[in-house]
Amino acid sequence: MTNIQHTLDFTPWPQESARYYRAKGYWQDKTLFDHLLDSVKTHPDALAIISGECSYTFQQLHDKVTQLAAGFITLGLKSGDNVVMQISNRAEFYICFFALNMQGIKPVVALPAHRTLELSYFCRHAQAKAYIFSDDTPGFDAQKTALTLQDECASLSYLIHTDQSVDSQITELSTLYEAQGIAQNSNANHVAFFQLSGGTTGTPKLIPRTHNDYAYSVIASNAICNFSEQTRYLCVLPAAHNFPLSSPGALGVFFAGGCVVLAQDSSPQNAFKLIEQHRITVSALVPPLALLWMKHAETADDDISSLKFVQVGGAKFSETTARELPNKLNCQLQQVFGMAEGLVNYTRLDDPIDVIVKTQGRPMSPDDEVLVVDDEGKPVPVGEEGALLT
């Protein structure tokens, strides 16, 4: 076994910045679970999640979260621990996400595409106490991988599988839910979880996101995107990705009292059926998937008229294709450029069409600071390419 001796240090915001963010109302000193709890109180019987044949109201989601949180503590996890979580598009992703961070346990949200190399790095670098995973990716034996990770990572005490396990060392998630939930044990100033960098420079880096800063990103995004209790959001991109998690994503839907519909199959054939069945109002796509949706719409007979707008981000969307999308899908286009580190840009829903199709928007916050610089770190003239500092 390889034992990593260092721990992950977190440098908090300067006190002056923190005071300013609170004075402006950006930081509300509420945890992610607190924001979910607001919707539980105001919309207890409204549907929060639809995942295949399963569905959860906000009250049911709350109960599952707190019961699982109690089970995690009984198992041996505690506030301050880190875990690696690799769960596909299913309700358990959000249940585990909230159950962990409402107890001060910080998940590293790995993507379904990550394999042993990346997962081993996450576990060792974060000194993860647990690996929580689903096993529904074709060609990937997650349970075998879990056992390999435990051999490689001395800190990894618990392997937790969302379904039936094939080895006594792997705990089934369903056995952890306790009859009674547990009270919250987390702090809005503390790290809620670790996002992953989306760059192409080797293994993704861990990005600590606090409850305060991440909640602000979600709430500010909701205001721009008009998310409400009427929003029905189709999650076709990996649930762990920053875009469908917080821009405004599933968290935005939960905070607004709307409903998240999860798609494990991202094909347009499946997506269009779900749009018709659940009267989806918005979804987030990457450009290649947007192209597939547009192509499928030419011959599909599904009723997708409930769609109000589609977000496209993650890569540059060509102007020509962007101009075609509203006509092909009969809805508005919103372009998004976001970074897991924090900066998020949106075209506004009422922007002129040239702004919507030619740009990826402007920063969501009036206090975002951006600068385009050359190789020497000097600002470049307007219109010239360079590196983005934020």
Task: List PLM regions with ranges.
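Structural core segment of the AMP-binding/adenylate-forming
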Residues: 1, 102-173
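Flexible, low-complexity linker/hinge segments
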Residues: 21-30, 165-191
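Conserved AMP-binding/adenylation subdomain of ANL enzymes
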Residues: 215-232, 242-281, 295-296
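Conserved AMP-binding/adenylate-forming core of the ANL superfamily
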Residues: 27-37, 45-90, 94-98, 115-120, ...
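Conserved structural elements of the adenylate-forming
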Residues: 62-68, 207-229, 236, 290-294
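Gly/Ser/Thr-rich phosphate-binding loop
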Residues: 280-284, 294-355, 369, 379
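Conserved beta-loop-beta connector loops within the AMP-binding
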Residues: 356, 371-390
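Conserved pre-ATP/AMP-binding loop-to-beta segment of ANL
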Residues: 44, 161, 175-198, 203, ...
